[in-house]
Structure formats: C-alpha cells, structure tokens
Amino acid sequence: MPVSGGGFEQCYNAQAGVDANTMLVVATTLTQAPNDKQQVQPILDALQAQAAKLGAATTLIADTGYCSENNVKVCEEAKLVPLIAVARQDHCPHWSERFTEPPALKADATPMEAMTHRLTTLAGRATYAIRKQTVEPVFGIIKSVMGFRQFSLRGLRKVTGEWNLVCLAWNVKRMAVLRPKVG
C-alpha cells in the first residue's frame, strides 16, 4: 500500500459486515487497497452469499470513506437502502436542523441526492446513528480488548485466514454474551 511520505508498506485493509441486531460479524473481506471506496461490492457479494442462511440485508450503513456514486448505485441494484455519510457531520447542529424534516426531495433527484436527502431526515439520522453502536465497538473491542492490532502472517491468503479467525473469535465472544442466562 502506498504510504505518506512516499514508498510502500505491506498493509491490509480489513472489512467486516456486522449485523445491527446482534453485533455478530456476518461477512468479512480483506484487500490491499488503500481506501474503502472499492470495498462495498466485495462485502455485498459476501453478504449475498450468506442471504439464504441469514436472510437478506435491507440497509447498508457506512462512513464517508465508502461514499461514491457507484457504491450508491451498487447498493440500490442489490435492493439495499444505502446510508453512506457524504461528509463529516457537525457534532452540535442547530436545534432547527435536529428537530425538523428537510424540504421534500425533488422528483428528478439522482440516487446520490436521494441518499443525501435520506440522511438528513429524522429517520435517516436515527438509522445512521446505529453505525456508531454496531460496527465501531466491534473494531474497538477487537483492537483494545482482544489486543489484535497487527497481522502476524504475510501474504493475502494467509492474512485473510487470520482476519477470519479474529472475526470468529469476536463472534464466539459475542455469542457468549447473547446466550440466554441459565439458572
């Protein structure tokens, strides 16, 4: 992967599809691509391969690193509602923005404009806020609590296996929490 200051380092870009209800990792991918814009299609493919077992996904929630018109189109073609942040959001928007609906969407809006409008609605903001309590804790706990900060192996195939094992370990840890309490 290219790094700042010139040169290249052997780096990997790990992705995880996380179920919003259970916080279980349901799909993983790993690449050597430096940014996330090209990672929506591979994770959608992984999710669609699991659809028969897990049920079809309905919404894709992602941060600004995934935002592109192509990703919005890919989501809509896969019958998913995309909620991909277009830009950083203000932490303290004015009260009139927080509690009022935006003006109606124009009839000839592009898919990107429709998604941007959806993100400004009260329901869209509430749904997007779920990302902060779904996928962010997964990566935070994997890094901080489980102590996984770098891969031990080299080579895309081996590192993909290592990433799958890390996600499996997270799922086992999470299933212990989700398990009904006995006694």
Role assignments for model-derived ranges:
Residues 1-183:
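Anion-binding and metal-coordination hotspots
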